[in-house]
Amino acid sequence: MQKYDLHLCEIDGGNLHNAIPREAHAVCAVPMKDKESVRVDLNIYLSEVENEFAVTEPNLVMELESESPCAEVMQQDAMKNFLHSIYAVHNGVYAMSQDIPGLVETSSNLASIKQRDGKLVVVTSQRSSILSSRKDMSQMVSSAFLLGGAEVTTGDGYPGWKPNPSSEILQVSVESYKRLFATEPKIKAIHAGLECGLFLEKY
C-alpha cells in the first residue's frame, strides 16, 4: 500500500459471526507499470507467510491471480483507514485461564468482511469466561475501528461462565458418573459460546 499506488476494488471473507473464517479474497488495482513489481513482491510475501504457518496451518493456500479491470475502487482515505484498522484490531487468543492450564479465557474473532450498499461491514465476536474481560476486549476492538473513522455498534452478547471446580453441580455430576461407570471422569473445560452463562446468571 505504501510502496505502490494501490486501490482496493473488492474484499470478501468469512460468514458466521461465531465461526473462524475459512477463506477470503480481495481484488486490488495498481498502475500497469507496477504490475510485475507488485506480483514479485506479493509472491515473496505469500511464500513467507506460508512458511511461517507451515506447522500450525499446513493446508494454508494463498494465491495471486490477474483480474479484469475494476469498474469502481474504494476511496483512498477510506481504504487506508480500513486497512490500518484491520491490521491493528486484535484477532485470536488474548488471554489464557489462570485457573485451568491450557484453557483460553478471552479471545476475539475477526469473523467476516462484506460489502453492502457501498459500505464495508466488518463483524467481530469476543468470547471470555469472565464478563469484564469480554467487555474490555470488545472495547479494544471498537477503539481500533473508531480510530479509523468507522461507525461501531455492539450487540448484547452472552454472559461468561468462569469454571468453578468446587461447584455443587460438578460434584454431583462426578459422583453420578463414578456410580454409573465405576471410574473417575475427566473434567475438562472449553472456550466456546454456551448457554451455561445464562443459566448461572439466573440460578
Regions picked out by a protein language model, each given a short descriptive name:
Residues 1-4, 37, 41-52, 140-148, ...:
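Generic non-transmembrane alpha-helical segments
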Residues 1-127:
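Midchain, well-structured core segments that form catalytic/ion-binding scaffolds
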Residues 63-109, 114-117, 131-136, 146, ...:
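An extended, acidic, His-containing surface patch that forms the Zn2+-binding/catalytic region
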